[in-house]
Amino acid sequence: VEEAYYCESCNFSKFLVDCHMVLHECELCYECIDCEKIYGSSYLQSSDNCSACAFGFDLKGCRNCFACAGLRHKEYHIFNEPVAPDEYARRMESFAVGSFEEAERMKREFAQWILRIPRQFARIRQSEGCEGNNIFNSKHATGFDVFKCEEGKFLDWAQEIKHCYDMLATGRPQWCLDCVTPDSSFRVLFSNWCWQCSDILLSDNCHSSTNLLFCSGLKHKKYCIFNVQYTKETYERLAAQILEELATTPVWGNLFPAGSSPFAYNETVAMHHYPLTKDDVLARGWRWSESLPFTTGKETIAMANIPDAIVDSSDDILTGVLACNACARNFRILAPELALYRQMHVPIPRQCPECRYRDRLALRLRKKLWDRQCGKCGKAIRTPYASERPETVYCEECYLKEVY
């Protein structure tokens, strides 16, 4: 990724601000979520191969579309209705100045309008025997944000895995179980951040190693227990004894307990995905921080003094400190960030990066499945759209008939 600011889980893209899961040749994107091959667009979600679009959901192969959803290979549309190119340009004039008030108004209007558009039960593309959401080019995989995976279950942000179970944030592991980021590893079990390893158990942050048990921070090592080097024969004998005893305890078969994390719960992204109160966290035996790294009350520029339109902005903002409209945290605008706002004709944000990140996550569906029925044919479906949500949800067959 090049020139990306306040983004998460983005790759092979450049010139991005406030994006989440923007992948594969995206450029000049602002507030885009779950998109691929997007150029010069803002406020898009679950869209592919689009350019010069704004406020869109599930668009494919579209250009110059504004406030549209479920369109395929369309151009010059507003709220899913075709308009002449000159009329489109005229109606976009007010938005082109990068007005904050206009952008906020459009967010509200689009959120209400889009409820009338049916949603596909899940975003699963070119895959076979898969269940979850945001799954692409995979076979017999269950999970969320899954790319080119085979024979895997309970996967989260996984790429090119084979025969793995309970994986988080990883690429190219094989035959691994209950791990975080065992990238390019083979037979790694119950371990965290062990890359390019094989035959590793209950270890943390070990790289390019093999045959380790209860180790941490090792590189280019083999036949170690608790970071102590053994011969191959001694390692195999001791490891067999330890594992036989471990098999009778609750430790065996699980990754390290969350309470052993060096980070407080509210310091991590877990707080955004699965928010808990302080009492809930402490009751589970986990850490809670009372001193998160931010300041308040040190602002030097009042939000009321920031021009509504980006075309009226001054470089003076680069030397000032702002206060978030939502949480009062202080934040600053960076020079390359401001340049991208101007280039993309989007307004200066009034919220801090943390609150903007929270709002983006709120637009994504939860990583959980519900049993529902297709809103058109009544077929049983497993979907990340909770039953109480207001959207109309269609099975794959009914949705494809709707959009093609």
Feature names for model-found ranges:
Residues 1-404:
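Long, distal/terminal scaffolding or interaction modules
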